[in-house]
Structure formats: structure tokens, C-alpha cells
């Protein structure tokens, strides 16, 4: 005689299985238990790693199988998974900051041209820069929407000039359109 497993997980021959309220092992579907989502493959094994479902991508922790929600560093790259565990691509606002995730889900760092506009994403955090930024041994100014500034710009009551192609702030004396900078 044996004990029927119900609404619990059990390790058999090195694989974790989940048994539902009727004692049947779950296969090929998501289960929520321990306040987290898990996926069990067609053989009933707990699933780990990347999971693609249609146009949505998920990641299940390699150590415990939990679906990731929030920021996660995977193989040296940062990703973001929304409240449903779906991997972010494109623009994402969280932690009171803007970020941009590439088509493969990896966080963007440094200068990036997106939809025809140049942005700068801080090297350590990936946060979109606004206001003054010093990088590549130059000074730049990014508008509130993150766009790099070009040409003449009055900032805090002072006029500045930013190169028309590179956005680099002019240093030393420079005259443009009747203004001396």
C-alpha cells in the first residue's frame, strides 16, 4: 500500500512532479503553488530555463522552477519580466525609471538610436538618461523624453550649443546664430 499524493510536489528519480487534488500528476501546464507559478512539461517534469509560448517569453529559475517576475540577471545579461512573468522588449518603466530592452530581452546600455532618436542608457544601471550626462569624454544634454539635444538650447537661464550631428556640448568660445557660447 502507498500514500496518494494530492496537491503537492514530489521528487522521483531526480525529477520534480506535481500531483493535483485528485492525485494525478500534472503534465503540459502551469500550476500555481507556494505563491508562485511553475510549469510542468509533457512528461510531468518541473520545467527550468527559457519558455516560449506564442509571442510571450518566460524564464523559470534553474534552482527552483519558479517563474521569474521583476529584474533577473541571466547568463551575464539583465532582463525584466512583468507582473505576469512575460519578458519585456522595447520600452519599460519600472522602479520609477525608463529602460529599453532589445528584441532578445537584454537591457540596453550606452548610446542607442531608437526610432530615429539618440538616447543614452547609464552603463551600470541601464536607466535612460535625462538632463546632463558625461560619457565618452564629452558632455551631453538629454531632454525629459530622453532625446539627445542638438543645436542651441537654453538650460537654467544659460545658452549652450550642442553639435548638430554628435550632440556633444561645445567647449571654449563658439558663435552660432548670433549667440556666443
Range-by-range predicted roles:
Residues 1-181:
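Extracellular adhesion/carbohydrate-binding repeat motifs centered on closely spaced tryptophans
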Amino acid at each position: 500500500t502507498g500514500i496518494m499524493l494530492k496537491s503537492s510536489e514530489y521528487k522521483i528519480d531526480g525529477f520534480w512532479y506535481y500531483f493535483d487534488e485528485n492525485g494525478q500528476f500534472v503534465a503540459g501546464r502551469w500550476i500555481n503553488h507556494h505563491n508562485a507559478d511553475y510549469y510542468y512539461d509533457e512528461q510531468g517534469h518541473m520545467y527550468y530555463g527559457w519558455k516560449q509560448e506564442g509571442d510571450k517569453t518566460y524564464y523559470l529559475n534553474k534552482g527552483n522552477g519558479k517563474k521569474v517576475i521583476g529584474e533577473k540577471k541571466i547568463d551575464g545579461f539583465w532582463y525584466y519580466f512583468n507582473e505576469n512573468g512575460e519578458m519585456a522588449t522595447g520600452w519599460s518603466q519600472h522602479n520609477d525609471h525608463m529602460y529599453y530592452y532589445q528584441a532578445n530581452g537584454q537591457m540596453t546600455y550606452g548610446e542607442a538610436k531608437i526610432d530615429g532618436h539618440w538616447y543614452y542608457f547609464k552603463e551600470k544601471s541601464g536607466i535612460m538618461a535625462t538632463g546632463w550626462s558625461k560619457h565618452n569624454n564629452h558632455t551631453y544634454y538629454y531632454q525629459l523624453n530622453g532625446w539627445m539635444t542638438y543645436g542651441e538650447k537654453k538650460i537654467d537661464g544659460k545658452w549652450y550649443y550642442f553639435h548638430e550631428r554628435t550632440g556633444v556640448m561645445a567647449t571654449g568660445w563658439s558663435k552660432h546664430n548670433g549667440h556666443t557660447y
